[in-house]
């Protein structure tokens, strides 16, 4: 039996109703489930127990990634108190978890492994019918989309683009010869994705080629890994890295207003609208702190110098996200062009002699 949930908001109840054995979703769904688990663990002693359980999972991660079930007393207790409850929220009977549609953040995959869940990330496009590579129960490596399928050839172009060749690759676009010519070169399909292949043949996908940010200093930044790390914060709904042809990168954040409003009430911050809330200096300081933590793990040219909070949620309905929950970057940047220009102008003025 196959079941499809068209609305992400209804996913929790759909999982309980269907009780699937195999679960396929885009990374945004796994982010949502992670965020709900973090929210439910708030307060003492819940958070202390939760953090302890995660530390137990971290120690047993090699076994989990090898497809084994840990047998230590600590693992059994952590599983009973925490991990089993997270899995119960996903139906309780899922044996196989698959992610596709966009790169899955490494930190997120690591967290799921800590609670006993291996997410098998795969990669493919419509033009490749569709799967190119996938992690399997036997060959599995976090941070990659696995090894390529039989009879599929993959190589990395000089500019980092993933090229694919094989019998499953399409012949061309119907009645669109110019687009076909641009997409195919000597039998190789240009995926439009940036990636690499490690020494063991595992393929990693970094970002969309068109989404790479080139600063005015000539440095290239892949936004998705940074955005994925930011979205692990319970206070962030969606993050969009800015900085193309600018002097430095910045980030536009659409908050998770459920958790932000709870935090504001707990900290006695009065507000009558979301616009007033995101303009509050204490709220800005909260997000500055989140970004500062992320910056510690970034190269100097990648560090985010400014944080821009918006009062709007980024959704499929308002055109900010695709049906697979990817950012529509050009639409978002166009919609907030004035605010973005003002952000950089203020930064220029602040650093002027």
Which role does the model predict for each range below?
Residues 194, 199, 233-259:
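C-terminal boundary motif of the adenylate-forming
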Residues 220, 234-238, 259-309:
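Conserved C-terminal helical docking segment of ANL/AMP-forming enzymes
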Residues 213, 238-240, 247, 288-353:
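Conserved C-terminal "lid"/linker of ANL adenylate-forming enzymes
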């Amino acid at each position: 039996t196959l079941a499809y949930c068209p609305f992400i908001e209804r996913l929790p109840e759909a999982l309980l109703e269907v009780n699937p054995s195999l679960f396929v979703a885009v990374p945004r769904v796994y982010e949502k489930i992670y965020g709900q688990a973090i929210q439910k663990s708030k307060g003492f002693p819940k958070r202390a127990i939760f953090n302890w359980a995660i530390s137990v999972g971290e120690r047993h991660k090699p076994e989990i990634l090898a497809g084994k079930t840990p047998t230590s007393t600590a693992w059994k207790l952590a599983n009973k108190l925490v991990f089993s409850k997270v899995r119960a929220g996903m139906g309780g009977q899922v044996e196989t978890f698959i992610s596709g549609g966009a790169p899955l953040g490494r930190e997120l995959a690591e967290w799921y492994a800590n609670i006993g869940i291996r997410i098998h990330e795969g990669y493919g496009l419509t033009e490749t019918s569709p799967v190119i590579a996938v992690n399997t129960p036997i060959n599995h490596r976090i941070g990659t989309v696995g090894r390529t399928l039989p009879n599929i050839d993959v190589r990395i172009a000089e500019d980092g683009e993933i090229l694919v060749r094989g019998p499953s690759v399409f012949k061309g676009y119907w009645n669109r010869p110019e687009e076909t010519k641009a997409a195919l070169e000597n039998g190789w399909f240009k995926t439009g994705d940036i990636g690499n292949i490690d020494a063991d043949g595992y393929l990693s996908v970094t970002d969309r080629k068109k989404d790479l940010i080139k600063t005015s200093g000539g440095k290239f930044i892949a936004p998705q890994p940074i955005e994925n790390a930011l979205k692990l914060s319970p206070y962030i709904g969606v993050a969009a890295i800015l900085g193309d042809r600018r002097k430095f990168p910045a980030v536009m954040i659409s908050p998770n207003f459920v958790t932000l409003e709870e935090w504001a009430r707990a900290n006695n911050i009065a507000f009558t609208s979301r616009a007033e809330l995101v303009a509050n200096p204490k709220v800005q300081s909260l997000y500055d702190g989140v970004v500062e933590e992320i910056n510690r793990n970034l190269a100097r040219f990648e560090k985010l110098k400014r944080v821009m909070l918006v009062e709007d949620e980024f959704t499929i309905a308002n055109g900010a996200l695709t049906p697979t929950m990817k950012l529509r970057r050009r639409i978002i940047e166009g919609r907030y062009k004035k605010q973005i220009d003002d952000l950089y102008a203020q930064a220029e003025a602040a650093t002027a002699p």
